[in-house]
Amino acid sequence: MKVAVIGAAGGIGQALALLLKNRLPAGSDLALYDIAPVTPGVAADLSHIPTPVSIKGYAGEDPTPALEGADVVLISAGVARKPGMDRADLFNVNAGIVKSLAEKIAVVCPKACVGIITNPVNTTVPIAAEVLKKAGVYDKRRLFGITTLDVIRSETFVAELKGKDPSDIRVPVIGGHSGVTILPLLSQVEGVEFTAEEVEALTKRIQNAGTEVVEAKAGGGSATLSMGQAACRFGLALVRALQGEEGVVECAYVEGDSEHAPYFAQPVKLGKEGVEEVLSYGELSDFEKAALDGMLETLNGDINIGVEFAK
């Protein structure tokens, strides 16, 4: 099993690489790529960690050696948010980066499962899809927007509020991966009751959690460490499913059969080909129904921007 981390010298990429070096199954190959010349050094540093995962780093303009033979590609390349920016401000730089990487993937490893971390995910996933479609290699089962950060934040904040162990909390998060498009389904959290005020406050906090970190870092970056953990959780789930484990379910932003938008985050069952089944997100509360209706114009607008950009 070969996993490639693209954008591996950045804050998310280094955190993700560290976690994968420690947690990938024995015998896995981990390839790191970044345009930054430090990347082979990041791999050298990580190679000293005594786990049965081989690691190589590649720098420069061409990601081909990292992508060759990859089963899973995790893309975190791009610029990070600074105070005052929202995820849409990142579009101007990051859209071009994702487009050129998708063009490479289409040639070098068209059968790989590709997880996109690079924001704005609502828009970068449709860009990658359009590029892969043009190249005639698109398989909607193998392209994911990684929204797991919204899930782990939801689990953490619910556990904090209710005095629970976070590992016992499961919160499906649907929609997209920015602002109002993030919808945690708090009505579905088992064994926990919320007041209407708690639901509203928690939902807002989960939606604005990225900004919370950007402001707390005071210009020194965005959510890199928690995003590394989230991407690792999703990446490992994908690896387990590709290796034949049954019943692996995570939320992800995929092109499914959603009635709401061409791309939509919801629980997906993972299997040997990527997405085995897009699962129903179940019954919504009145608050959640209203929030879903209220986000769709924004989400569909984000998707259209990506489709137009890739034309």
UniProtKB/Swiss-Prot annotation:
The UniProt record gives the binding positions of NAD(+) as: G7, A8, A9, G10, G11, I12, G13, D34, N94, I117, T118, N119, M227
Chain positions recorded as substrate binding sites: R81, R87, N119, R153
CC terms in the record's Gene Ontology section? cytoplasm
Which Gene Ontology molecular-function terms are recorded?
Answer: L-malate dehydrogenase (NAD+) activity
Q: What is its EC number?
A: 1.1.1.37
The superkingdom of the source organism is Bacteria
Q: Offer one example of a GO biological process linked to this entry.
A: malate metabolic process
Q: Please give the catalytic activity noted in the UniProt record.
A: (S)-malate + NAD(+) = oxaloacetate + NADH + H(+)
**InterPro entries for this protein:** L-lactate/malate_DH, Lactate/malate_DH_C, Lactate/malate_DH_N, Lactate_DH/Glyco_Ohase_4_C, Malate_DH_AS, Malate_DH_type1, Malate_DH_type1_bac, NAD(P)-bd_dom_sf
Q: Does the keyword NADP apply?
A: no
Pfam families (alphabetical) = Ldh_1_C (PF02866), Ldh_1_N (PF00056)
Keywords noted in UniProt: NAD, Oxidoreductase, Tricarboxylic acid cycle
Q: Where is the active site?
A: H177
Stated family: Belongs to the LDH/MDH superfamily. MDH type 1 family.
What the entry lists under HAMAP family is as follows: Malate_dehydrog_1
- Biological function: Catalyzes the reversible oxidation of malate to oxaloacetate.
Record's subunit section: Homodimer.
PANTHER family cross-referenced by the UniProt entry: MALATE AND LACTATE DEHYDROGENASE, MALATE DEHYDROGENASE, MITOCHONDRIAL
Q: What is this protein called?
A: Malate dehydrogenase
Tell me the organism. Vibrio parahaemolyticus serotype O3:K6 (strain RIMD 2210633)
